[in-house]
Curated annotation (Swiss-Prot):
Belongs to the class-II aminoacyl-tRNA synthetase family. Type-1 seryl-tRNA synthetase subfamily. PANTHER family: SERINE--TRNA LIGASE (PTHR43697:SF1), SERYL-TRNA SYNTHETASE (PTHR43697). GO terms for molecular function: ATP binding; catalytic activity, acting on a protein; serine-tRNA ligase activity; transferase activity. It is an enzyme of class 6 (ligase). This is Serine--tRNA ligase.
């Protein structure tokens, strides 16, 4: 959520930023109108409560002097009723204001390029060279079924479309990738490993920005009013919700592996085969809590931490900076890492690394003190995939396949695969 002071002090600047996000700049005027009404009602309520205190003192004085206070008591009752009416109106206006504020995205960093879609994202780095095959390469969804590593048909029978059973060496490879990523991030990158709840309440989803705007993308357990997490970013970021941290708790660096659940409401017809776009998938998440002055350097570090996985696995990738039209709701600046997938003959997103500045912290009320006597300030929160496990799985299968139908295990993964260096080939 944005600071209301930004609306009051820099409305024209904010209108320009909102317009680049594809929103009508009039939303800024709507917020200012509600804010003005709210402040007017607060002033009115305070005046009436001061008058009520004066009348209360007058009643007490009359009673001490054994004078008739009926008229003043009647005035007191009317004031009480009027105050209730004003408080009710104030609550209604405040609720409208908070809702309107909650639907407005973060202000993007000045580095973010203007654009309407992902086609206008800008490549800022490329690593590795896509492999040239001297045989007809297969798509990962075909190869893993031939090798007995996955079964999509049985998953569809059990759960529906966009689910998978990983079996035998497929399950082993998925587990190896998760263990490898967590080990790398904890032992070399300085993150603390967490195991997180995979059901969270609405306040947590609000804190990270999924609610109220993106409820249709979520799976909800209606009876309990809980949501299945779309990413471990949600519980990790909310770990410090409603807390004031000490300066020595920053930076806070956490990593967690979790299942992620997404309805993919707007993705009909896209990536319908394979592991790229499932309703349930595994991901290793990175989350950081930073002092405001440190967060932009932290974004570069976090992105490099995710890139280190791709480089050690020797998977060709590129880094792009998202344009205004593709930037996430809560993000001020995002780098996407895209891995080369031969079956698509293009790079596909495997990680998004973002600085949310104080946007999530304001919603979740996460603050810190520079010293014990200092005024609390909002932290900056950052997050990134380190990495999406299923997409890494797919990239390894496609980029490391051999002419005989086998898959070579990347050297970095061999210790996590029990020393195994190859999967397959399939036997008829």
């Amino acid at each position: 959520m944005l600071d209301i002071k930004l609306f009051r002090n820099e409305p024209d600047y904010l209108k320009g930023k909102v317009k680049l996000r594809g929103m009508d700049p009039k939303v800024v005027d709507e917020v200012l109108e509600l804010d003005g009404k709210r402040r007017e009602l607060i002033g009115k309520a305070e005046e009436m409560k001061a008058e009520r205190n004066r009348v209360s003192n007058e009643i007490a004085e009359k009673k001490r002097n054994k004078e008739d206070a009926d008229d003043v008591i009647a005035e007191m009752r009317k004031l009480g009723d009027d105050i209730k009416e004003v408080d009710t109106e104030l609550n209604e206006v405040d609720e409208k204001l908070q809702y309107r504020l909650s639907t407005i995205p973060n202000v993007m960093h000045d580095d973010v390029p203007e654009g309407d879609s992902d086609e206008e994202n800008i490549e800022v780095k490329k690593w590795g060279t896509p492999r040239q095959f001297d045989f007809e390469a297969k798509a990962h969804w075909d190869l893993i079924e031939e090798l007995g590593m996955a079964n999509f048909d049985r998953a569809a029978r059990v759960s529906g479309a966009r689910f998978v059973f990983l079996t035998n060496e497929g399950a082993q490879l998925e587990r190896a990738l998760m263990n490898y990523m967590l080990t790398k991030h904890t032992t070399q990158h300085g993150y603390t490993e967490m195991m997180v709840p995979q059901l969270v309440n609405a306040n947590s989803m609000y804190g990270t920005g999924q609610l109220p705007k993106f409820e249709e993308d979520l799976f909800k357990v209606e009876k309990e009013g809980l949501y299945m997490i779309p990413t471990a970013e949600v519980p990790l970021t909310n770990y410090y919700r409603e807390e004031v941290l000490s300066a020595d708790q920053l930076p806070g660096k956490f990593t967690a592996q979790s299942a992620c659940f997404r309805s993919e409401a707007g993705s009909a017809g896209r990536d319908t085969r394979g592991l790229i776009r499932l309703h349930q998938f595994d991901k290793v998440e990175l989350v950081r809590f930073e002092k405001p002055e440190d967060s932009w350097d932290a974004l570069e570090q976090l992105t490099s931490n995710a890139e280190a996985i791709l480089e050690e696995l020797e998977l060709p990738y590129r880094r792009v900076i998202l344009c205004t039209g593709d930037l996430g709701f809560s993000s001020s600046k995002t780098y996407d890492l895209e891995v080369w997938l031969p079956s698509y003959d293009e790079y596909k997103e495997i990680s998004s690394c973002s600085n949310m500045t104080d946007f999530q912290a304001r919603r979740a009320n996460i603050r810190f003190k520079r010293d014990k006597d200092a005024k609390p300030e909002l932290v900056h929160t950052l997050n990134g995939s380190g990495l999406a496990v299923g997409r890494t799985f797919a990239a390894i299968v496609e980029n490391y396949q051999n002419a005989d139908g086998s898959i070579t295990i990347p050297e970095a993964l061999v210790p996590f695969m029990g020393g195994k260096t190859k999967i397959g080939p399939a036997t008829k």
